[in-house]
Amino acid sequence: MKIAIGCDHIVTNEKMAVSDFLKSKGYEVIDCGTYDHTRTHYPIFGKRVGEAVANGRADLGVCICGTGVGINNAVNKVSGIRSALVRDMTTALYAKEELNANVIGFGGKITGELLMCDIIDAFIKADYRETDDNKKLLAKIAHLETQHVNQEDPDFFNEFLDKWDRGDYQD
């Protein structure tokens, strides 16, 4: 099984710990970045994880940022992605078994590495339990998806990154 994983600069260490854990379990890890602690933007890496899952390069995805909120919102904008921001086992299993979540998101500064690893392991092993009700709910969610014209362009964020480099945006 292939697992795509991505993060922002705030939780690179946590992502690497999770990546090492997944590899130790025999999973192939597709590291979508970021790879260091240089200030960056979580939407880039959420998009990369989402695209890896949506296009079939990865079976499932893991997204991590400081609180998990930003990167989880970003990954959910990719068509075909159903990501759940979780902090506990019950929510993660519900997301997979009832809503067929294909990405799981975490706040790396909220949830500890060991708990993240336990939750991810259970999430991967859980199976979607298809029912008529679940199918109807997923169809309604899929109906909400919209595709932006240039969204699949790998340079989609360049305009915003150029503005950042010029100092147009501030933290």
UniProtKB/Swiss-Prot annotation:
Catalytic reactions of this protein: aldehydo-D-galactose 6-phosphate = keto-D-tagatose 6-phosphate
Family matches, as InterPro entries: LacB, RpiB_LacA_LacB, RpiB_LacA_LacB_sf
Record's keyword annotation contains Isomerase: yes
UniProt keyword Ion transport, yes or no: no
Keywords, sorted A to Z: Isomerase, Lactose metabolism
A Gene Ontology biological process term: pentose-phosphate shunt, non-oxidative branch
Pathway of action: Carbohydrate metabolism; D-galactose 6-phosphate degradation; D-tagatose 6-phosphate from D-galactose 6-phosphate: step 1/1
EC number: 5.3.1.26
Entries under SUPFAM superfamilies matching the protein: Ribose/Galactose isomerase RpiB/AlsB
GO molecular function, one term: ribose-5-phosphate isomerase activity
Subunit composition and interactions: Heteromultimeric protein consisting of LacA and LacB.
Family of this protein: Belongs to the LacAB/RpiB family.
Cited PANTHER family: DNA DAMAGE-REPAIR_TOLERATION PROTEIN DRT102, RIBOSE-5-PHOSPHATE ISOMERASE B
UniProt-recorded name of the protein: Galactose-6-phosphate isomerase subunit LacB
Organism: Streptococcus equi subsp. zooepidemicus (strain MGCS10565)
Gene: lacB
